[in-house]
């Protein structure tokens, strides 16, 4: 809170405040005048002045602090001295103190009324002694006045209680804290018990131990914050914890209850002070640049800005300004600068700083200086700070000595002669002395040969050089001088420089895999030895190989690969592996992104490419346009799912099937309507064909004459022009010599080649007919009448003689009829239709019996094939059991040691029975009920007495109205067992009955219907006719007597309905677990 030095600095009082104040002063008979004087008043005096100014205005502005406009808030008096935001020209702390002072004055006023009533009673007693007449009147007046004062007092107390808030919620509703600063708001909330702890969300009482965050100044219960600190440190395993309000890191773990300024521990609660305050001046420093302590009493929240006036100098210290300390602290980033030149002496000691007022050192001197070279012929400009060290050069010109400072070498050759006057200096520009240098070729300087190994006097055989111009002799030794590369010169002693090094070195190549021989001169010229080895290391992308010759990163890659982990850690290691710079792939990735429209522009990399960042700023509508995505739309986004129906027109012009809107790339559901269509061959018009089916076939043979003009097309119904292009059938013409048909490929337009022997099979026999043999015809142009003779053997004559003897004695000798009688009619009928399968089963079972194995498993097969295996195994004395559900149901055969093979093969028995049909066969009933009813057995694998009587199908849950029998028969026409029977169809209101008529030939009608029901149900559901097909019993009046329920072999009952999209094998997989064919 800022204090004013002059009463005139106080805020001006509004007119209504002055009037109310005068009335209050008259009623209390007190005069309140503000302190005057030029000196800075006491802080408490200034607060009292502000309180007096606001005191009377509370009645009009009380609605801002309390919902009741008739009474202000009664807050205990406290010394709140803060610099807060202004509220209608008054300070928030003044408003709080004014409320407390108003409370005190009301209490004093109530006490004064009580004292005056007592004085009136005493005066009434004294008047009774002096005048009896006046006693009654005076006493009555005093009594009435006392009663009136007491009544007034009680009314005022009741009004004050009614104006007092009932709870903290009502106080909070009546306060407008939005215009107060943080400190004032905290004081009001703490005094009125409105401040809540952010940990437990309970109110903070003035007498409760607290802790305040030094960053956000938020207040918490001390017990709550200690528990928060302990749990946070234990969970995070760190020394620091976070403030629950501002999340700032706190390192202090021993938390104590201190006052706001931190000077007093466990401050006592004083009624007239700010809660949790020690009552002493705060004394905190405000910022790094401020050295003045806070003058306010101990308070919550941040300290107000410093109002002290300080003097601040400019950067160069020549000028200064006076300003508030807080304002100076705020503008630390923009220091005060004057307009003067620094003028400080620079480090060179000669020049001064020419910069404008600045901070820090002046820096190096950049004053330009013109410097000469050592020889004095050239000069250039240097900054003063970078001027090199000078050297004194002296030169004698025409008897006078010229002297100057040389700072650098101009690199030009020196033109001065040595003292001999014959040789010139060969050095570049250098400092010059006044005297000439001694000649390096002088006889007193040069006493040895150039390599330094022999004396010149020795080489000249006792003679000496007389002058520096005499030739210098050389010796026969190797020079041996140390070259710049470190090797020695290998030439003979010579004059001048040694030249280049010719030493041959063996060093590793660039990839360090091989060694290469090079000269030292090549290495000095930058030659890099390489080999022809190709680097096969994978690059950083993991797709491409290096394929460089003699790669310099090969050895680094080997080291990197050796450090790779193995196992599961390798996958994560590859994501963060650092590659050598030689093996970083710089090719563009160029893979197609997930959007399908753009390509990856990153460098070739491991793992998947990032998602496409392209976006469209146009709306993306669905096909019908009623659902759309608004921009920006990421590239590759599919069109949105539309909940509305599809509006695409159909080419057939039938009504559209109800389905949701979809992209045009997806076709609409096929048209379910039935129409008439002409078949592909054009012979027939087929009815009840689905509209979506384009190619309709009648199933008849084409029978069009082929190009050979002899044979006819044997393809089934097909479009025109798709007949067999070239005839590859047998010729079929009668041969000339044998009358068999020609078996050569069709050769229309050419006669048959009679030179080729006929390959037609023939069966010839001996004269008695016992021996039969199959041969080929072999008739040809060269052998028109081939002879195929079979001679009789001795056995033939014996059998012929025995036959004649048996006939004479009337004895039957044919035992084959007994062997054929062992077989049943069902076995021989099945063999006539499926001879290959029956031969294979017979061969397997005969081998199984001969090998004396205990069991044999057949592969999965169809129902009628399993029935044949069961019947034939029973005939052989074997036991057979079916396992596994459809379509992998198979038969297991067991040999219990009672097997017996028939004398005649099934093939022979069938052939002999065809020749002698009068032979009686074994009845099917003798093979047991399982084989007798194998082709029409119950789907559960067992027959129950309750299943008898069922004689028809009933179709329920009809999907569409059907009034034509052909619609049902066209769907079930390709079921073989269904076509063997004659059916009658009866139409009801909500059902259709399918009743077989010729059921007398069926041994087990219920088993037959049970076997047919799943396939019939499936076909009718796929055709959209009925979703349920059940077995029922109908009487002579065509009324349904009972319906067979579906039984499932499991512990729990289940009612499964046929799903059209599933196969028959998954309709009821529990039923297939039972023993079945």
Swiss-Prot record:
Residues 15-29 have a biased composition (Basic residues). GO terms for cellular component: chromosome; cytosol; Golgi apparatus; nucleus. Disulfide bonds: none annotated. The modification Phosphoserine is found at residue 33. Residues 52-64, 100-116, 153-173 have a biased composition (Basic and acidic residues). Residues 835-897 form the R3H domain. SUPFAM superfamilies: R3H domain, RING/U-box. Residues 136-149 have a biased composition (Low complexity). GO terms for molecular function: DNA-binding transcription factor activity, RNA polymerase II-specific; RNA polymerase II transcription regulatory region sequence-specific DNA binding; zinc ion binding. Residues 1-173 are annotated as: Disordered. It is found in: Cytoplasm; Golgi apparatus; Nucleus. PROSITE patterns: R3H, ZF_RING_2. InterPro entries: NFX1_fam (IPR034078), R3H_dom (IPR001374), R3H_dom_sf (IPR036867), R3H_FAP1 (IPR034077), Zinc_finger_PHD-type_CS (IPR019786), Znf_NFX1 (IPR000967), Znf_PHD-finger (IPR019787), Znf_RING (IPR001841). It comes from the Eukaryota. A zinc finger (RING-type) spans 197-247. A zinc finger (NF-X1-type) spans 290-308, 348-367, 420-441, 485-503, 541-558, 595-614, 708-729, 738-760. Keywords: Cytoplasm, Golgi apparatus, Metal-binding, Nucleus, Phosphoprotein, Repeat, Transcription, Transcription regulation, Zinc, Zinc-finger. Residues 76-87 have a biased composition (Polar residues). May play a role in transcription regulation. Belongs to the NFX1 family. PANTHER family: NUCLEAR TRANSCRIPTION FACTOR, X-BOX BINDING 1 NFX1, TRANSCRIPTIONAL REPRESSOR NF-X1. This is FKBP12-associated protein 1 homolog. It comes from Schizosaccharomyces pombe (strain 972 / ATCC 24843) (Fission yeast).
């Amino acid at each position: 809170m800022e204090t004013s030095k002059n009463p005139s600095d106080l805020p001006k009082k509004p007119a209504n405040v002055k009037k109310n104040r005068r009335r209050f002063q008259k009623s209390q008979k007190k005069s309140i005048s503000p302190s005057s004087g030029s000196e800075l008043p006491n802080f408490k005096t200034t607060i009292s002045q502000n309180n007096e100014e606001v005191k009377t205005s509370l009645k009009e502005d009380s609605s801002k602090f309390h919902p009741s406009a008739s009474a202000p808030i009664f807050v205990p008096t406290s010394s709140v001295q803060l610099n807060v935001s202004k509220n209608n020209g008054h300070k928030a702390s003044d408003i709080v103190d004014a409320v407390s002072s108003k409370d005190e004055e009301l209490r004093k006023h109530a006490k004064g009324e009580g004292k005056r009533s007592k004085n009136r009673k005493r005066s009434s007693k004294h008047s009774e002694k002096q005048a009896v007449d006046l006693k009654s009147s005076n006493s009555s007046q005093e009594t009435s006045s006392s009663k009136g004062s007491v009544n007034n007092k009680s009314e005022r107390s009741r009004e004050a209680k009614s104006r007092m808030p009932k709870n903290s919620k009502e106080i909070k509703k009546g306060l407008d804290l939005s215009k107060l600063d943080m400190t004032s708001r905290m004081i009001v909330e703490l005094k009125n018990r409105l401040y809540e702890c952010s940990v437990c969300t309970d109110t903070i009482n003035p007498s409760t131990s607290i802790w305040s965050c030094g960053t956000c100044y938020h207040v918490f219960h001390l017990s709550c914050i200690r528990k928060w600190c302990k749990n946070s440190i234990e969970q995070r395993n760190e020394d620091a914890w976070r403030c629950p309000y501002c999340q700032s890191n706190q390192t202090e773990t021993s938390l104590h209850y201190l006052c706001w300024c931190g000077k007093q521990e466990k401050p006592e609660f004083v009624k007239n002070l700010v809660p949790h305050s020690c009552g002493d001046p705060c004394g905190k420093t405000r910022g790094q640049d401020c050295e003045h302590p806070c003058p306010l009493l101990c308070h919550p929240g941040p300290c107000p800005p410093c109002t002290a006036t300080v003097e601040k100098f400019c950067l160069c210290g020549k000028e200064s300004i006076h300003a508030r300390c807080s304002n100076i602290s705020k503008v630390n980033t923009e220091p005060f600068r004057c307009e003067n030149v620094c003028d400080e002496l620079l480090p060179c000691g000669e020049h001064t700083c020419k910069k404008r007022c600045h901070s820090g050192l002046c820096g190096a001197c950049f004053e330009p200086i013109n410097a000469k070279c050592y020889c004095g012929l050239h000069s250039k400009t240097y900054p003063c700070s970078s001027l090199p060290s000078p050297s004194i050069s002296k030169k004698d010109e025409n008897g006078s000595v010229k002297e100057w400072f040389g700072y650098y070498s101009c690199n030009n050759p020196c033109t001065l002669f040595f003292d001999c006057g014959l040789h010139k200096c060969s050095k570049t520009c250098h400092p010059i002395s006044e005297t000439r240098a001694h000649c390096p070729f002088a006889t007193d300087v040069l006493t040895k040969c150039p390599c330094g190994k022999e004396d010149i006097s020795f080489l000249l055989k006792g003679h000496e050089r007389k002058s520096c111009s005499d030739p210098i002799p050389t010796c026969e030794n190797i020079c041996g001088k140390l070259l710049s590369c470190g090797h020695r010169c290998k030439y003979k002693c010579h004059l001048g420089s040694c030249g280049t090094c010719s030493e041959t070195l063996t060093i590793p190549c660039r990839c360090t895999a091989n060694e290469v021989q090079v000269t030292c001169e090549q290495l000095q010229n930058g030659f890099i030895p390489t080999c022809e080895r190709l680097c096969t290391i994978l690059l950083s992308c993991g797709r491409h190989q290096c394929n460089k010759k003699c790669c310099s990163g090969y050895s680094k890659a080997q080291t990197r690969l050796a450090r790779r982990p193995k196992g599961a850690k390798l996958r994560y290691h590859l994501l963060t592996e650092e590659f050598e710079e030689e093996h970083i792939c710089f090719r563009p990735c160029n893979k197609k992104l997930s959007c399908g429209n753009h390509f990856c522009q990153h460098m070739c990399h491991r793992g998947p490419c990032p998602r496409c960042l392209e976006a469209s700023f146009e709306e993306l509508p669905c096909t019908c346009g009623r659902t759309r995505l608004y921009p920006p739309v990421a590239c590759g986004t599919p069109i949105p799912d539309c909940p509305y129906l599809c509006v695409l027109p159909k080419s057939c012009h039938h009504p559209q099937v109800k389905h949701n809107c979809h992209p045009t790339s997806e076709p609409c559901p096929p048209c379910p309507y039935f129409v008439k269509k002409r078949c592909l061959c054009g012979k027939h018009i087929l009815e009840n064909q689905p509209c979506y089916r384009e190619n309709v076939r009648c199933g008849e043979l084409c029978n069009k004459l082929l190009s050979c003009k002899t044979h006819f097309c044997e393809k089934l119904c097909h479009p025109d022009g798709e007949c067999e292009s070239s005839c590859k059938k047998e010729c079929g013409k009668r041969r000339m010599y044998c009358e068999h048909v020609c078996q050569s490929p069709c050769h229309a337009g050419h006669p048959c080649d009679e030179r080729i022997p006929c390959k037609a099979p023939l069966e010839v026999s001996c004269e008695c007919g016992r021996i039969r043999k199959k041969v080929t015809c072999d008739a040809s142009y060269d052998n028109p009448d081939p002879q195929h003779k079979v001679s009789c053997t001795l056995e033939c004559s014996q059998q012929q003689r025995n036959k004649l003897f048996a006939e004479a004695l009337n004895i039957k000798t044919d035992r084959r009829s007994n062997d054929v009688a062992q077989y049943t009619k069902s076995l021989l009928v099945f063999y006539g239709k499926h001879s290959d399968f029956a031969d294979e089963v017979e061969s397997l079972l005969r081998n199984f019996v001969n090998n004396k194995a205990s069991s044999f498993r057949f592969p999965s097969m169809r129902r009628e094939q399993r029935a044949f295996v069961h019947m034939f195994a029973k005939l052989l004395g074997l036991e057979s059991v079916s396992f596994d559900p459809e379509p992998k149901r198979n038969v297991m055969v067991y040999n219990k040691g009672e097997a017996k093979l028939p004398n005649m093969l099934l093939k022979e028995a069938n052939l002999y029975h065809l020749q002698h049909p009068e032979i009686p066969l074994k009845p099917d009933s003798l093979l047991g009920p399982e084989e007798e009813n194998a082709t029409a057995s119950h789907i559960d694998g067992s027959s129950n007495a309750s299943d008898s009587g069922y004689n028809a199908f009933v179709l329920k849950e009809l999907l569409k109205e059907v009034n034509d029998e052909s619609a049902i028969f066209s769907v079930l026409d390709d079921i073989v067992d269904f076509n063997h029977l004659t059916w009658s169809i009866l139409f009801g209101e909500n059902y259709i009955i399918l009743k077989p008529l010729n059921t007398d030939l069926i041994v087990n009608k219920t088993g037959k219907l049970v076997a047919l029901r799943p396939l019939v149900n499936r076909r009718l559901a796929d055709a959209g006719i009925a979703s349920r097909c059940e077995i029922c019993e109908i009487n002579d009046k065509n009324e349904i007597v009972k319906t067979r329920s579906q039984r499932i072999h499991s512990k729990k009952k289940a009612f499964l309905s046929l799903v059209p999209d599933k196969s028959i094998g998954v309709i009821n997989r529990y039923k297939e677990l039972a023993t079945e064919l």
